[in-house]
Amino acid sequence: MYSNDDYAEGGYEEYGYEMAADDGYDRSFYPMHEDVKKFLVYFCSVIKGGVVYEIQNLYENTFPKLSEQHFEKKAWPSEDEVAHLVDNDNLFMILYKELYYRHLHARIQGGPSLEQRLNSFYNYCNFFNYILPSKEPVQLELPDIWLWELIDEFVYQFQNFAQYRARLTDKSDEEMDMLLNNNSKVWNILCILNVLHSLVSMSKIKDQLEAAAAGRDPEEVAGEFGRHSFYKMLGYFSLVGLLRVHSLLGDYHQAIKVLEPIELHKKSQYSHIPACQISTSYYVGFAYMMMRRYSDAIRTFSSILLYIQRTKQLYSARSYQNDQINKQTDQMYHLLAICLVLHPQCIDESIQQVLREKNYHDNMYKMQCGDLDTFRNFFVFACPKFVSPVPPPSDAPLDDYVKEALEHQTNVFMDEVRQQQELPTIRSYLKLYTTLPLLKLASFMDHIPQDEIGEQKIENLLTHLLCFKHKMKNIVWTKGASGLEGKFQSGSELDFYIDKDMIHIADTKVSHRYGDFFIRKILKFEDLNRRLHNLKG
């Protein structure tokens, strides 16, 4: 669909607009709480002073706490109410409005109005117009968690607006006119890609990642902007944003390609934001699954799910990001279950235990028996919320077009499943034998006596056996920074060849390594024992 070359050299294009004078959320007036006033004034002062650790404390702790106390189901104070408190500080107001509109999207029932969606876009334009056209690095320091959530929210609001725009049945004539005639560039896909690629290019994050992988100092290639943590991290998070955008559009090859400088299966200095790491693995694993690279998908999902198991206490507190992490975790277990049905292989015992405890095995058995409804339900629950890159035509009938993109991707997936529908049954019979006549297997498959098997039945069986060979051979990543590279490997637990009318079968299943599992449990128990003794002491 789109390639890096389309955006890497073009430079950032500024977006102009005319912002509404007052976009405050429709609510009865109430006086601003004193603690909210103090927070806003102090927040502005620490951002001006560049005190990153204090900015992070206010952003991660104080702002959510005040939101819970005073703004659970209503908007934060409007721009007009806040501006005079902070002496109309332009940069702070841009950052405040980023949080303001994010809160509207997350907490207000029914979501923001069209005008608020437009003004949120204009506010992002203000922010990017402030940092991107600058001839020298701007004097702004923000914690990495805010930079990640800013890029993540930017892509989310694009996705949310694309779905809102595709739902024509609940719009007034005035809203339709605003959407079709006056705001064609608002939340436009080319604008989103332009911003993300510009951040990647300005930060030289790809050059830095390649230098680090080669054992060189990234500072040598970082350039004037990339040496600053602010630009470097925005560039890195924009790569993940591009992964998400291309996945939402169904361009899975490009989704993996944009991450080429990142060694997906290795930890790095950039993986310290859990939400970013988990989101990356979710979209990478999903893209691999849709590209029929099941081994890579299983490894990606298993690795991140093990990480989540070890750090799950971090995601217990209620927050938007933690809710998103918990949802993506559930989605990844569903996707892992699909991959294991289509491409059985050994996985970590602790992941297997979760699949058993949460009753995934019952549904996996249904999928192994060819239950297409279970496949579809798992996919629809676990897949991203796909969007169309363009709005419905201006002369389109008033209808709800939101599900068109989802239905298209679901049909693509289900076509692949139908091709493999007979394979679990074939596998179950082949596992019982070392040699098996074609005639006998055809009899098993069709549940009829061997003497009633005709030439057409044998031809159909040979087609299914060839399909088995083909589907069980995948490209698997082995080394290198490109997640698209790899070697063809057979992932089946058994292999076979056909000599005349006889199938010869070899079991290649690797036995479970229970020793490693028990060693880990023993070490964990000993560590727990030591801690208990220390508490007693």
Curated annotation (Swiss-Prot):
Transmembrane segments: none annotated. One of its GO terms (molecular function) is translation initiation factor activity. Signal peptide: none annotated. It comes from the Eukaryota. The keyword Acetylation does not apply. PANTHER family: EUKARYOTIC TRANSLATION INITIATION FACTOR 3, EUKARYOTIC TRANSLATION INITIATION FACTOR 3 SUBUNIT L. InterPro entries: eIF3l, PCI_dom, TPR-like_helical_dom_sf. This is Eukaryotic translation initiation factor 3 subunit L. Pfam families: Paf67 (PF10255). GO terms for cellular component: eukaryotic 43S preinitiation complex; eukaryotic 48S preinitiation complex; eukaryotic translation initiation factor 3 complex. Component of the eukaryotic translation initiation factor 3 (eIF-3) complex, which is involved in protein synthesis of a specialized repertoire of mRNAs and, together with other initiation factors, stimulates binding of mRNA and methionyl-tRNAi to the 40S ribosome. The eIF-3 complex specifically targets and initiates translation of a subset of mRNAs involved in cell proliferation.
